[in-house]
C-alpha cells in the first residue's frame, strides 16, 4: 500500500520536471526571439531612413513588404516602426504574430484597423504590449497615467501620400479594444473630429497642459 503513493509521487516529480524544463525552454526561446526581432526592426529602420531625418524610403519598404502604409516614431521612446495594412485574405490579427517580413513573430508588427486609412481622420494602430520595455508599444502601457504621459515626446506620422506630420500628444486613456469611443471611422469634417476628440478627452486619464 505504501509503494503506490511513492510511484505516484515519482510520476508527479517527473511531470513537474518536464513542465519546468518546458517552461525554461520557452523562456529561453522568448529571451532569444525578442532581441532578435528587435534587431530585425533596427535593420528595417536603417534601410528606410528617418522621418526626423527628412524622409522615408517608401520604395525600399514596398519592395520588402507591399503592405506598408505608414511609419510611426515617438520622441523619448523606443517606438520607431513601420505600420502595415493587412492584405485581403489575411486572417484577423495576422500581424499580431507576424513581423514586417510576414514571418511568424512573438512581437508582430504594428498594423492599421482596416476600417480606417493611414491618411484618414482616424487611424487606429494595433501593437503589442510585451514584457520588454524596448519592444513594440510596451512603453505606452502606463501612458494613461499622467506621470508617464508627460514623458512622451512628439509623434512623427509618415505616409507615402501625406509626407510626415509632427503631432503633440493631447491625451491618453486606457480602454478595451471594443470601447465605443474609438469605433468612429466616419468623421467627415474638422468640426465633427474636434467634437469627437473633446468627448474622448473628457474621459482621459492624462492630458497635455
Model segments located where?
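N-terminal Lys/Arg-rich, disordered targeting/topogenic segments
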Residues: 1-11
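Sec-dependent N-terminal signal peptides
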Residues: 12-22
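Solvent-exposed, non-transmembrane regions of membrane-associated and secreted proteins
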Residues: 23-209
Amino acid at each position: 500500500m505504501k509503494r503506490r503513493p511513492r510511484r505516484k509521487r515519482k510520476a508527479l516529480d517527473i511531470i513537474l520536471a518536464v513542465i519546468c524544463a518546458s517552461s525554461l525552454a520557452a523562456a529561453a526561446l522568448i529571451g532569444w526571439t525578442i532581441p532578435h526581432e528587435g534587431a530585425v526592426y533596427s535593420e528595417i529602420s536603417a534601410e528606410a531612413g528617418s522621418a526626423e531625418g527628412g524622409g522615408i524610403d517608401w520604395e525600399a519598404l514596398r519592395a520588402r513588404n507591399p503592405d506598408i502604409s505608414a511609419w510611426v516614431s515617438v520622441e523619448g521612446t523606443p517606438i520607431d516602426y513601420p505600420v502595415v495594412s493587412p492584405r485581403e485574405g489575411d486572417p484577423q490579427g495576422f500581424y499580431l504574430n507576424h513581423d514586417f517580413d510576414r514571418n511568424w513573430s512573438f512581437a508582430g508588427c504594428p498594423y492599421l484597423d482596416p476600417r480606417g486609412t493611414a491618411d484618414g481622420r482616424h487611424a487606429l494602430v494595433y501593437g503589442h504590449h510585451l514584457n520588454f520595455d524596448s519592444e513594440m508599444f510596451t512603453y505606452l502601457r502606463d501612458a494613461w497615467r499622467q506621470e508617464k504621459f508627460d514623458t512622451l515626446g512628439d509623434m512623427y506620422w509618415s505616409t507615402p501620400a501625406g509626407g510626415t506630420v509632427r503631432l503633440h500628444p493631447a491625451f491618453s486613456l486606457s480602454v478595451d479594444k471594443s470601447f465605443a469611443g474609438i469605433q468612429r471611422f466616419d468623421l467627415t469634417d474638422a468640426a465633427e473630429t474636434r467634437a469627437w476628440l473633446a468627448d474622448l478627452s473628457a474621459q482621459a486619464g492624462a492630458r497635455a497642459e
